[in-house]
Regions:
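C-terminal motif of bacterial Sec signal peptides marking the signal peptidase cleavage site
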Residues: 16-19
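A short, solvent-exposed beta-strand micro-motif common in secreted/extracellular proteins
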Residues: 109-119
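Tryptophan-paired
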Residues: 68-105
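Short coil-to-beta strand junction motifs in C2/discoidin
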Residues: 46-55
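Glycine-rich, aromatic-bearing surface loops/beta-hairpins
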Residues: 128-154
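Bacterial signal peptide processing site
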Residues: 21-24
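Bacterial N-terminal signal peptides that target proteins for export
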Residues: 1-9
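Short amphipathic, basic-aromatic surface patches that mediate peripheral association
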Residues: 35-45
Length: 154
């Protein structure tokens, strides 16, 4: 008995691609943000930790987000980002409490921007931006410690 390897390979490839299509029809693609504020996050004038507002932006491009100052982004996001802004939402986080935030991205979204409204904004690392795939299933960890915010890898 002779095996038809090219035919077998093609059939396997079609089954694999069909499986991906089925997975997307069963569960919508999403991006999961795991926001991990430390216990000492956003200290007040007496060095006590405080709640923090996080604003998440869905962006078509990242240049205007990277170039803007904090107060323009926070107070006037539509005017500041213009057509780069696809959507945004706010999340209030508490020190030491981990948040899981799941997002179904708009098809125009290419980047996710994250802004943290720290009390001491002058000394804070308050902005992150990273690539996003509106058709994929991504998990992103954001660690927040005192006055800094950074992406973490597993």
């Amino acid at each position: 008995m002779r095996c038809n390897w090219p035919g077998f390979f093609l059939l396997s490839l079609l089954a694999l691609l069909g499986g991906c299509a089925i997975a997307n029809s069963v569960a919508d693609p999403e991006t999961a943000l795991r926001i991990e504020p430390a216990i000492n996050v956003n200290p007040d004038i007496k060095d006590r930790p405080s709640p923090l507002t996080i604003r998440i932006f869905e962006l078509e491009a990242r240049h205007s987000f990277r170039a803007a100052d904090f107060f323009k982004l926070y107070d006037e996001p539509e005017q500041t980002l213009g057509s780069d802004l696809v959507a945004s939402e706010d999340i209030a986080v508490r020190p030491g409490r981990v948040y899981e935030h799941r997002m179904s991205l708009n098809k125009e979204t290419r980047y996710i921007g994250v802004l943290a409204a720290f009390r001491d904004i002058q000394n804070a690392q308050w902005r992150l931006v990273f690539e996003a795939d509106p058709r994929g299933y991504d998990e992103v960890r954001i660690a927040i410690d005192r006055l800094t915010m950074k992406l973490e890898s597993d």
